[in-house]
Amino acid sequence: MLRSEKSVAVEDIVNIYKESPSVIITHYHGLTVSQVSSLRESLKSQEAGFKVVKNTLAKIAANQTGLNNIVELFAGPTAIAYSKEPVGMAKLVVNFAKANDNLKIIGGVVDNHVLDKHSIKELSKLPLLNELRGKIVELLQAPATKVLGVLQAPSSSMARVIQAHASKN
């Protein structure tokens, strides 16, 4: 690889680190091209990506972006999964790793916090951001409907009492 190609590759990885608050570092040794393509396609549906990286270049990019904590994770045949939404990407990568023993999760970074492989597996168990938003809206709407029911109850009870009294007379 020429020096100019290396600098372009480092710049590309630096952009990934800067634009994606979540990165999962994996070893992909033994995956077929079709398996890697399948993983890339499923990640693309979550607006995420998967890139095979050269360890020395990934380390240089990590040092340039202040991610010095992850440098030691780059050893062996390494690829990174990256996304702006960490939970959806973690779910896809963890599920793919369960189905394909040749993909090993090494660690990662979410919002500049270094995670080990166990933390990434726990992250994958969390609900997606859109699911959380839906639950919050649901929780906010529930008290309003209960208050409305309580406010309507006395008036409907009063109407029934008046109706009963009117039917007696």
Swiss-Prot record:
Pfam family, one: Ribosomal_L10
Any one biological process term the GO annotation gives: translation
Keywords attached to this entry: Ribonucleoprotein, Ribosomal protein, RNA-binding, rRNA-binding
Keyword hit for rRNA-binding: yes
InterPro entries per record: Ribosomal_uL10, Ribosomal_uL10-like_sf, Ribosomal_uL10_bac, Ribosomal_uL10_bac_type, Ribosomal_uL10_CS_bac
Molecular function GO labels: large ribosomal subunit rRNA binding; structural constituent of ribosome
Domain of life (superkingdom): Bacteria
CC per GO annotation: large ribosomal subunit
HAMAP family reported for this sequence: Ribosomal_uL10
Family note: Belongs to the universal ribosomal protein uL10 family.
PANTHER family: 39S RIBOSOMAL PROTEIN L10, MITOCHONDRIAL
Biological function: Forms part of the ribosomal stalk, playing a central role in the interaction of the ribosome with GTP-bound translation factors.
Record text on subunit structure and interactions: Part of the ribosomal stalk of the 50S ribosomal subunit. The N-terminus interacts with L11 and the large rRNA to form the base of the stalk. The C-terminus forms an elongated spine to which L12 dimers bind in a sequential fashion forming a multimeric L10(L12)X complex.
NCBIfam families to which the protein is assigned, alphabetical: PRK00099.1-1
Protein name, per record: Large ribosomal subunit protein uL10
Species annotation: Rickettsia canadensis (strain McKiel)
Taxonomic classification: Bacteria, Pseudomonadati, Pseudomonadota, Alphaproteobacteria, Rickettsiales
